[in-house]
Every structure is written in C-alpha cells, then in structure tokens.
C-alpha cells in the first residue's frame, strides 16, 4: 500500500487537509453529533449518504486530503453502543473507508479528472483510546497511567489493519494526548505495517504542553527520532498538532524547530477554531478564530499539511486553499 506515485512533494509541496468532519456532518444530519459516544462514527451505519455528502463538502472546497469517519470508531465501541456483532463492527470500519472512496470517485467525476488520480488522498483517521472511553480523556491522556504500551498497541492494531486492508492511502494517527500512546501507535505502524504512510499529530493544552502536561517539543522530537531509528522518513508525512487552539500553534512549532536543530522535521497542523469543548454539556463554548489568518506563519515554520479540526468548515478550507494557491510555490 503506497501513496499513488502520480503525486509527490515535488509536484505539490503543501497539501490542504479537510476541516472538522463531525462539525460539518452535524449540518448534514438532523440528530445531534457532539456528545454521542460514537460521535460521527454512528452515521456510517445510520446515514451513509450524509457521510459521503460531508466528504464532498470539503472536496468541492479544495481539500487535497480527506479523513475517513473513523476517529471514534472501534469494534468494541460499535458492539457497546450500536449493539452489533464484532463482525458487523469490522464491516462498519471497512464501510467508512468505502464511503470516503465513493466521495472521491464522485468528486473526480464532477471535475472531469481520471479515476486513478492520486489526489485527493484518503487518510484513515486513527483517534486515541480516550475517544473510545467517551469521558473526555483524549484531552488529558490520564488512561496512560492505567495501561501498558502493549495494551494500547493491541487496541489500535485492529482498526489500523482494517483501514489499511480497505485501501486508505495512509494513516492519520491523531489527537494523541500523551507520549506513551503516541509512541505505542507509531511503533505499531513502523514495525507491523512496513508500507504504510502516516502522520502523527498530538493534542496540546497550551503553548508548551501536550494534553497530558508533557513537553510538546520533546515529545515530537522523540517521535522523529523513533522514525529515524527505523529509517522510515520516506513513510512519514508529518509530525505535528491537531485539535488545538490556533493561538498555541506557532509557539508550539517554534519550540520544536528550536530543539530539532538542523533537522527539518516535516510538519502537519490542523487546529480548531479556539473554542473550548465542555465535556459536561457535550458542546463548544466561547468564540473562535479564522484559522486562515494563522496559516502564513505556520507555512513559514515548515508546515506542509495544513487544514482544520473541530468547528473548521468547508468555507474555512476554501480560504486556506486560496491562500496556499496564491503562494504559487514552484516545485
């Protein structure tokens, strides 16, 4: 499994990722999405047309990358919250990949592009164990104190295997709140899936620290060293941040480039708007930022995949698309 060879960094050095899938999905369904124990994943089963429509909303606004609707998907979660069999749980994760593929196929047909086009890429969304727990712990990582790396690897392996077998272009290991889980899932991909392309994205609570309180720059650098130790730099699409306040991103990335020295670590960023998620209410509070206004400084720092996370909509992605296109970066 490789990213289609018709695309490479030389031909398109900055890629625009979609925005917040479940945020946009909420506009395409009548039921409440935030606060659901399966979040958007439920709709792969109950409203696949809305899932395809949500992918298309981002593709039609310039996204080079879409993520499967699997952030909060797990076989265990589907068994627990949908009351289905394990076999059906596996099928629903496979279906999520197929829905993304259907959206890509429809979009390419709309723009008159060949069906085998490399872009847009479809990345398998691999969210943290805390998302399955449905208790807000993906914003603390406190479960790392109660679990071993081996347990976390075993839990992540099933979904990764299913996504890769279903034909994603790569894996988005995302919203990881603590270094132990980030290392566990990165090691799993490096050692068990030798052809898989991937990025690793950490969740941070301020300008210096991951959700767990660990230093972001040190954690990200240790992940980079891990990739280097396996000589897997060519498989890494980026290391970075997501589901984070955009105001924190530049200080966080600057701290990483400082400790990285002469190493040029490929960077990925897709922030929220800056509102706060209230776990008790299952909703967002506060006012947000226009993500596009931060993009110039992020690109200056070496970001090569940029987009949005929660509450970042297709109109925001279009604004990012227009800015990136306006740079007119020559290969």
Swiss-Prot record:
Zn(2+) binds at residues 243, 309-310. InterPro entries: Betaine-hCys_S-MeTrfase_BHMT (IPR017226), HCY_dom (IPR003726), HCY_dom_sf (IPR036589), Hcy_S-methyltransferase (IPR051486). SUPFAM superfamilies: Homocysteine S-methyltransferase. PROSITE patterns: HCY. GO terms for biological process: methionine biosynthetic process; methylation; S-methylmethionine cycle. Keywords: Metal-binding, Methyltransferase, Transferase, Zinc. Disruption phenotype: RNAi-mediated tissue specific knockdown in glial cells, motor neurons, muscle cells or the midgut results in reduced adult lifespan. RNAi-mediated knockdown in neuronal tissues or in the midgut results in sex-dependent kinetic pathologies with males suffering reduced locomotor functions while females are unaffected or show increased locomotor function. RNAi-mediated tissue specific knockdown in eye imaginal discs results in progressive loss of eye cilia from 10 days of age onwards. Residues 3-324 form the Hcy-binding domain. Its EC number is 2.1.1.5. Disulfide bonds: none annotated. GO terms for molecular function: betaine-homocysteine S-methyltransferase activity; S-adenosylmethionine-homocysteine S-methyltransferase activity; S-methylmethionine-homocysteine S-methyltransferase activity; zinc ion binding. Pathway: Amino-acid biosynthesis; L-methionine biosynthesis via de novo pathway. It catalyses: L-homocysteine + glycine betaine = N,N-dimethylglycine + L-methionine. It holds the Pfam family S-methyl_trans. Its cofactor is Zn(2+). Involved in the regulation of homocysteine metabolism. Converts betaine and homocysteine to dimethylglycine and methionine, respectively. NCBIfam families: PRK09485.1 (NF007020). Belongs to the Betaine-homocysteine S-methyltransferase, BHMT family. This is Betaine-homocysteine S-methyltransferase. The gene is Bhmt.
């Amino acid at each position: 499994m490789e990213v289609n060879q018709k695309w490479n960094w030389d031909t398109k050095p900055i890629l625009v990722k979609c925005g917040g899938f479940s945020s946009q999905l909420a506009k395409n369904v009548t039921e409440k999405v935030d606060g659901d124990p399966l979040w958007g994943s439920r709709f792969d089963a109950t409203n696949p047309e809305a899932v395809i429509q949500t992918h298309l909303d981002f593709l039609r606004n310039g996204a080079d990358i879409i993520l499967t609707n699997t952030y909060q998907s797990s076989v265990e979660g589907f068994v627990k919250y949908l009351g289905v069999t394990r076999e059906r749980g596996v099928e629903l994760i496979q279906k999520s990949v197929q829905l993304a593929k259907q959206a890509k196929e429809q979009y390419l047909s709309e723009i008159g592009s060949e069906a085998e086009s490399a872009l847009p890429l479809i990345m398998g969304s691999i969210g943290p164990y805390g998302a399955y727990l449905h208790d807000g712990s993906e914003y603390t990582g406190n479960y790392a104190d109660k679990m071993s790396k081996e347990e976390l690897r075993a839990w992540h392996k099933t979904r990764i295997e299913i996504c890769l077998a279903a034909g994603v272009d790569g894996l988005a290991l995302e919203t990881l709140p603590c270094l132990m889980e980030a290392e566990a899932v990165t090691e799993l991909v490096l050692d068990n899936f030798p052809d898989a392309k991937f990025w690793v994205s950490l969740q941070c609570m301020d300008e210096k620290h991951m959700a767990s309180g660990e230093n972001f720059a040190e954690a990200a650098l240790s992940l980079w060293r891990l990739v280097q130790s396996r000589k897997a730099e060519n498989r890494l699409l980026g290391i970075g941040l997501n589901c984070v306040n955009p105001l924190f991103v530049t200080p966080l990335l600057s701290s990483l480039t400082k400790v990285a020295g002469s190493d040029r670590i490929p960077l990925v960023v897709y922030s929220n708007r800056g509102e706060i998620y209230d776990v008790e209410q299952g909703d967002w509070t506060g006012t947000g930022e226009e993500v596009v206004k931060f993009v110039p400084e992020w690109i200056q720092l070496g970001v090569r995949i940029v987009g949005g996370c929660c509450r970042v909509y297709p109109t925001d992605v279009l604004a990012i698309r227009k800015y990136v296109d306006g740079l007119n970066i020559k290969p």
